[in-house]
């Protein structure tokens, strides 16, 4: 598939500035062909985010965008990353990102290692402290 890809975006479902369909439409106008919505997630909002984004796949296709449903696990205690990532995939996430250890977002020590050793995690974002 040609065009631009963005596999790490946020919407007003967490700390982004656009509602999900607006993000999809703007990405379409800018020439993106694949976009993943990967709002910050933990056990309290994981199912809600996945269900919400998956509802947009058909409207996104009408704008010429292949929408991937994702989550960015943030502040999950490292021992719980594997089961949380597995739950995300089981419940319909196409991509699982983990927010890494960085000076900007002080997630728990050991998060980077837990993410890198988990087969259900696709991307370690903002690894900062390696």
Q: What residue ranges belong to the model's regions?
A:
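Histidine-centered catalytic micro-motifs
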Residues: 4-14, 40, 127
